[in-house]
Amino acid sequence: MYRFAPSPTGDMHIGNLRAAIFNYICARQKNMDFILRIEDTDKARNIAGKEEEIKEILNLFGISWQHYYIQSENLKFHRQMALKLVSEKKAFACFCTEEELEAKKELAKKQGKAYRYDGTCEKLADIDVLECEKPFVIRLKKPTHTMKFTDFIKGELSFEPENIDSFVIMRTDKTPTYNFACAVDDMLENVTCIIRGEDHVSNTPKQEHIRASLGYNKAMTYAHLPIILNEEGVKMSKREAHSSVKWLLESGILPSAIANYLIMLGNKTPCEIFTLEEAIKWFDISKVSKAPARFDLKKLLQINREHIKMIKDDELNKILDLNKDLAQLAKFYTQEASTIKELKEKMRAIFNTKDFGEFETECKILKELLKDIELFENYEDFKNELLSKSDLKGKKFFMPLRIILTGNIHGPELSDLYPYIKNFIHELARI
């Protein structure tokens, strides 16, 4: 069983989407169920509407799930599991205040040591715990042995007990911490493989320790994906616009192109342009590079142009909101436009009223002739016919003709454009 477990606390990051895609692919390859779990226990940071937005984005990418869970609905199980650990003396109530802990952290810092919980409350007698009326958290006792696990990408990893420490699993408000809720939910939902970002590597031994302490002995496999760097080689921040999947989609980049790029990023693929369904046939999680991958927006835009060309004409007309068949013309313009947004602007420029500027007189002459000119099969015949009838030459012929046909003074060669725009010339002359 594979899962994708986002939090509804902001726009989906491309790193999260990459994890979703990889989990989905692996689930399909192994004919296993795929879980979508919304991790909403951090109520203060949750943003209204983001849960639905996550589902909408996954649907756009063709990612479906067989099971859907809301983490906060498992709260009673989290509390039951925490109580079980306390009753078995594997966890304990900690009454240390934030101020007391902060003072100990500062002391460790001055001494040049890494802070570790000193076990103050672990030593309390049961009667002292029962009689104490102070707010408390629940801490899980640190493991007694080295925690080891195998990662499909990073290989063998191990963590010593002192690096895991006695960590908090339940807060003072009786809600679970991230690691506890995540570990318990993965156990309850029978998750067998976790693919996520490498920023979660340090969480893995804690989650393994939680499940082991609860007596769960089913093996879990892992793959921690390397971080995505920006174009300057720095870890991509959520504040950078193109780290947001929503921003990429609103910019006119196709879901299929984004998926293509994220699968290819830091990975060896048999070809450069492919669909998600094609990738399912050959994708190998162990082939993903250990090294951080640098995000290249130009490369993504190049891939997007190729995916636009792959779209069926009737579908592209719908995507571009066109009421006529302009798909082939739009695909021709991918030499200049890289996104759906840019293609819409190109089509609007062609079929909207134009500004003739200094060529107003020449444009009027050409428009009259174009209203019923014979639409020759090749551009040279068309051009020569128009030249002879208009009596215009050079710049005063080609510039106004370009404006009438494209709405711009610069653009592709008219001879290249002609086959795609030929059938619309009479219409353009009447705008």
Curated annotation (Swiss-Prot):
Primary subcellular site in the record, as a coarse category: cytoplasm
Gene Ontology CC: cytosol
Annotated binding of ATP, by residue: K238
GO molecular function, one term: tRNA binding
Catalytic activity: tRNA(Glu) + L-glutamate + ATP = L-glutamyl-tRNA(Glu) + AMP + diphosphate
Gene Ontology terms: biological process: glutamyl-tRNA aminoacylation
Motif 'KMSKS' region, chain ranges: 235-239
Subcellular compartments: Cytoplasm
Role: Catalyzes the attachment of glutamate to tRNA(Glu) in a two-step reaction: glutamate is first activated by ATP to form Glu-AMP and then transferred to the acceptor end of tRNA(Glu).
Family listed: Belongs to the class-I aminoacyl-tRNA synthetase family. Glutamate--tRNA ligase type 1 subfamily.
PANTHER family in the cross-refs: GLUTAMATE--TRNA LIGASE, GLUTAMATE--TRNA LIGASE, MITOCHONDRIAL-RELATED
UniProt name for this protein: Glutamate--tRNA ligase 1
Organism per entry: Campylobacter jejuni subsp. jejuni serotype O:23/36 (strain 81-176)
